[in-house]
Swiss-Prot record:
Name of this protein: Pyruvate, phosphate dikinase
Cofactor field: Mg(2+)
Subunit structure comment from the entry: Homodimer.
Organism ancestry: Eukaryota, Amoebozoa, Evosea, Archamoebae, Mastigamoebida
NCBIfam families cross-referenced by the UniProt entry: PRK05878.1 (NF004531), pyru_phos_dikin (TIGR01828)
Start and end residues of each stretch annotated as Central: 400-497
Length: 885
């Protein structure tokens, strides 16, 4: 097995082996772009390194040395040479892009001797020692785990001492002194000599990159974005000959996107810094210039035109938006990296539509490029169209959308405070180790850095609004204060940012809901509907929720939870009285009070849906859930007796008695659903009557209806037979007689008990449709209580890889999924036209939707805000696993 590949020998399509960065360098070499010489160490070596207890695989360094000698031969330079030294960068790169998650070391090979040679060769002492101090700080931080504050404070102190603001204002002697102080401080921190042998440095660096794969921020990023080992397993290491953007004003470094990664607009987008190294742009240490200004830059003749040509070549080859890094060394341009651009959902959607219209890709390819979970970003709120207040300050619009939150100055504080409120992370510049703060923040605001800085790239990838480079803000992290002009912003103060314009506003701004069905996203959703075979319904309990569902593209209501209608403030007291009733007559009296209220809700739903399916699930939870808890009542009664208060005491004791009567050892598999409807048929009778009368009244108004009655917790076909004969048919006859019309409806069941799935052939003799309740079906199949397991052991099981994921979030295909497949197969043996859907929370989760498509379900039902996600996921499922209907 080949373990190291020269750029000209590597297969650029094999990102799994060479990593995205290595594969990109190989591809750029292949298509004739100017790439420095170098080689890639494969991801397999990273996996072996970790499996060996973080030890270098045997013989690997010998192979690295052979490849380094080839680079020496091609370049005419010598690694560690004291006359013409070869210096390299050591870069990480996994199969999937993880901006800022992994580590890069520049200028490797420098020591006290090679730096003198570099100064002589370039006739630029300042450049040589600037490169040296950068190398020491990067190497110390990444390879030796030195706290970067050690270097940052030393550099800041030197600038203060010299009375300057920018690194570029320090002279050669300053850089010399900084390099030696950095080495001394590194040795003090590590209690060991700084490595001077270039091959020792290289081995340290390769090990550091391999180790970073299992570093906290890389693991957190993979967990947040659900990046599995199948998608990316280990990081490759690219060893690249150094080229320098910090050799003077005829040198530069930059980052570009072939299209705008924030909006998707087909315009060249990027930034560059003169007399700088690549990490300066990405780290956001200085705020760069926009790339178009290079066209007028007399120090860099022809470079902008060359970049435009490279932009065209990259998109022509990859048919994807590319994010690339370049360096210009003394007017000569080199490409250091290209990868598929990390864009927010807005840009991904627009570029997809535009590329289809440009003939670069197909509709199917455009849809497959959208990560379904990223669709949530398109539902972000925005600033009001005509907002008149002047902003406090303006930065760069780095990631679109608007966000309001309480200001925090530290990622750890963001995590802590986000547990109770919305937070906005405000930093001078962000670093990769701030990633945990990004996850919880509503938005990110930085004082330094451009649109291609770490903060901007990661925020766009997460779909978080971001304003970067707001230089009018001065932050004092120690005091947790920011100054914007004369205004002091303290931790906890509210700010609003607009990532689409770069504006920052004082206080909370009322934000507007997005428009889902129009524009580029509307086009993508239209294409998704043309492709997908599985319907997308909504879980909705009120007419207002149904209206919102239609706006998002729902094709029906797959679950109306009637118990939620009982929980309204004016209804709950009636429900409680019904439960406390001692006689059937008394119970019916209160049910009769509830009936017209439920009927009005049903009328609203049916009218809103206007002929689309409305599936009403009859009462599901046990009755005790509508009453106060035993502990609550006992405490209240104890306190009343203790204080001598007697008013209302008798009523409390009546409720306590009923709560004790209704108490169950295991209520989740107890007296609920059809069992309750069988022992207390008057409850289901009221609900059926309300729904059928609502259907009749809507029909009489000339509005189409598609009414479906769904029974929960069925385990035995006789439960359905009993309910049909003794309740459903008599009520249906009475309603048709009362209104003098036919009132059509469908009668079906939830399949949420394992026995129902295993006897689906019998149950299908009664039920004309099934709907999987996968929350309870998962509980039953695993014998896990959801409430207990999610808090106690499932996270540990996922961490230890006992389970691949939380089965209550992502459908368990081998177990729960197989039970579903059995039910579908058996049910359709009895009733070939059987309609089958899913209405558990899995109905909006992309992987689960794919499984539902694969086993032949007719529809999925999910919350309104998951409908666009489900539509995209359903189309992707059809593209991956085509079926006829």
């Amino acid at each position: 097995m080949q373990r190291v590949y020269a750029f000209e020998d590597g297969d650029g399509t094999n990102k799994k082996l060479l990593g995205g960065k290595g594969a990109g360098l190989c591809t750029m070499t292949k298509i004739g772009l100017p790439v420095p010489q170098g080689f890639v160490i494969t991801t397999e070596m990273c996996k072996q390194f970790i499996a060996n207890g973080n030890k270098m695989p045997e013989g690997l360094m010998e192979e690295v040395k052979k490849n380094m000698q080839l680079v020496e031969k091609k370049s005419g330079k010598v690694f560690g040479g004291e006359e013409n030294p070869l210096l390299v960068s050591v870069r990480s790169g996994a199969a999937m892009s993880m901006p800022g998650m992994m580590d890069t070391i520049l200028n490797l090979g420098l020591n006290d001797k090679t730096v003198v040679a570099l100064a002589k060769l370039t006739n630029n002492e300042r450049f040589a020692y600037d490169s040296y101090r950068r190398f020491v700080s990067l190497f110390g931080k990444i390879a030796l785990n030195v706290d970067d504050e050690v270097y940052d404070k030393t550099l800041e102190n030197k600038k203060v001492e010299k009375g300057v603001k920018l690194d570029t204002e320090l002279d050669a002697n300053d850089m010399k002194e900084l390099a030696q102080v950095f080495i001394k401080k590194t040795e003090e921190f590590t209690k060991q000599p700084f490595p001077v042998d270039p091959y020792a440095q290289l081995e340290f660096a390769i090990c550091a990159v391999f180790r970073s794969w299992m570093g906290k921020r890389a693991v957190d990023y993979r967990r947040e974005f659900k990046i599995t080992p199948e998608q990316a397993d280990g990081t490759a290491v690219s060893v690249v000959s150094m080229v320098y953007g910090n050799m003077g004003n005829d040198s530069a470094t930059g980052v570009c996107f072939t299209r705008d990664p924030g909006t998707g607009e087909n315009m060249f987008f990027g930034e560059y810094l003169k007399n700088a190294q690549g990490e300066d742009v990405v780290a956001g240490i200085r705020t760069p210039q926009i790339i178009s200004k290079m066209a007028e830059d007399a120090d860099l003749p022809g470079c902008y035109e060359q970049l435009l040509d490279i932009r065209k070549k990259l998109e022509g080859y990859f048919h994807e938006v590319q994010d690339f890094e370049f360096t210009i060394e003394r007017k000569k341009l080199y490409m250091l990296q290209t990868r598929n651009g990390k864009m927010n959902a807005t840009a991904t959607v627009r570029t997809g539509v535009d590329m289809v219209e440009e003939g670069l890709i197909t509709k199917e390819q455009a849809i497959m490029r959208i990560a379904p979970q990223s669709v949530d970003q398109l539902l972000h709120k925005n600033m009001p169209a005509n907002y008149a207040e002047a902003p406090l300050v303006k930065g760069l619009p780095a990631s679109p959308g608007a966000a309001t939150g309480a200001v925090v100055f530290d990622a750890d504080d963001a995590v802590e405070q986000a547990k109770g409120k919305k937070v906005l992370l405000l930093r001078e510049e962000t670093k990769p180790e701030d990633i945990h703060g990004f996850f919880v923040a509503e938005g990110i605001l930085t004082c330094r850095g451009g649109k291609t800085s770490h903060a901007a790239v990661v925020a766009r990838g997460m779909g978080k609004p971001c304003v970067s480079g707001a230089e009018g803000i001065k932050v004092d992290v120690a005091k947790k204060i920011a100054k914007i002009g004369s205004l002091e912003v303290h931790e906890g103060d509210i700010l609003t940012i607009d990532g689409s314009t770069g504006c920052v506003y004082k206080g909370e701004v009322p934000l507007e809901e997005p428009q889902v069905g129009s524009g580029y996203f509307g086009t993508i959703l239209k294409w998704a509907n043309e492709i997908k075979k599985i319907g997308v319904f909504a879980n909705a309990d009120l007419p207002s929720a149904a209206k919102k569902a239609l706006e998002f593209g729902a094709e029906g209501i797959g679950l109306c939870r009637t118990e939620r209608m009982f929980n309204a403030v004016e209804r709950l007291p009636i429900v409680v009285k019904m439960i406390l009733s001692n006689t059937l007559e008394e119970r019916k009296k209160y049910l009769n009070e509830l009936m017209p209220l439920q009927k009005q809700d049903f009328i609203g739903l049916l009218k809103t849906m206007n002929g689309l399916p409305v599936t009403v699930r009859l009462l599901d939870p046990p009755l005790h859930e509508f009453l106060p808890t035993l502990e609550e009542l006992m405490r209240e009664i104890f306190e009343m007796k203790l204080s001598g208060k007697t008013e209302g005491l008798a009523e409390k004791e009546v409720v306590l008695k009923k709560v004790k009567e209704l108490m169950e050892v295991n209520p989740m598999i107890g007296h609920r659903g059809i069992r309750l409807g069988t022992t207390n048929p008057e409850i289901y009778e009221m609900q059926i009557r309300a729904f059928l009368e609502a259907t009749a009244e809507v029909i009489k108004e000339g509005i189409k209806t598609h009414a479906e009655i769904m029974i929960p917790n069925v385990t035995e076909v006789n439960e359905l037979i009993n309910l049909r004969k003794n309740v459903l048919e008599p009520v249906h006859e009475e309603v048709e007689k009362k209104y003098g019309i036919k009132v059509p409806f469908m009668y079906g069941t939830m399949v949420e008990c394992v026995r129902a799935a295993l006897t689906a052939d019998k149950i299908a003799t009664e039920a004309s449709f099934f709907s999987f309740g996968t929350n309870d079906l998962t509980q039953g199949t695993f014998s896990y209580s959801r409430e207990d397991s999610e808090n106690k052991f499932i996270p540990k099981y996922v961490e230890l890889k006992i389970l691949p994921a939380n089965p209550f979030e992502i459908l368990d295909r081998p177990g729960v999924g197989e039970v579903m497949r059995i039910a579908v197969t058996k049910g359709r043996q009895t009733r070939p036209e059987l309609l089958v859907g899913i209405c558990g929370e899995h109905g909006g989760e992309p992987s689960s939707i794919e499984w539902c498509h694969m086993i032949g379900l007719n529809y999925v039902s999910c919350s309104s805000y998951r409908i666009p996600v489900a539509r995209i996921a359903a189309a992707q499922a059809q593209i991956r696993h085509p079926r006829e209907n």
